[in-house]
């Protein structure tokens, strides 16, 4: 939603996601942004664009650029209750997995969007709830296969003294 009034310029957009009669066993993430931020051939972060090479991994494609776009992020728990929502920045994340049809996304808290950090318990196995960014992963090189390698390795690393990325399916 946006305010429109004669002789008034509004810098404030408000988004809201509604989910009706959803039957799901995992959390739901909703991302709302102007379509061109993701799908414009000139500036969309999710598409090949006009400069992509014709062969994998499609260097020159828009998704190889370090572009950040504004997005409204909403996170719904398994019981359909809204857990958290905020304005953020979004970038394509990863190495060659960016070339997959489903791409990983980094969601960034930044003061210019309204939050300097994300304060929410996304993960049960960590002792902190404050994050500068979260990653919505496409399972990397396991994409279109088992889609569980990243999660399985994270589980194996939980009791080690090494840093690891936790997950929430």
Task: Tell me what each language-model feature is.
Residues 2-169:
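Phosphate-handling architecture centered on phosphoinositide signaling
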């Amino acid at each position: 939603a946006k305010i429109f009034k004669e002789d008034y310029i509004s810098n404030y957009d408000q988004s809201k996601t509604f989910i009706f009669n959803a039957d799901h066993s995992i959390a739901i993430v909703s991302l709302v942004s102007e379509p061109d931020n993701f799908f414009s051939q000139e500036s969309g972060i999710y598409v090949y664009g006009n400069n992509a090479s014709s062969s994998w991994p499609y260097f020159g494609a828009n998704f190889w650029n370090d572009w950040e776009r504004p997005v409204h992020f909403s996170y719904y728990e398994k019981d359909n209750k809204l857990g958290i929502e905020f304005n953020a920045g979004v970038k394509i994340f990863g190495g060659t997995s960016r070339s997959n049809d489903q791409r990983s996304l980094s969601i960034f808290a930044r003061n210019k969007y309204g939050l300097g950090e994300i304060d929410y318990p996304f993960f049960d196995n960590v002792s902190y709830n404050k994050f500068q960014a979260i990653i919505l992963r496409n399972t990397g090189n396991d994409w279109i296969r088992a889609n569980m390698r990243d999660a399985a390795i994270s589980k194996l690393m939980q009791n080690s003294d090494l840093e690891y990325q936790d997950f929430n399916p």
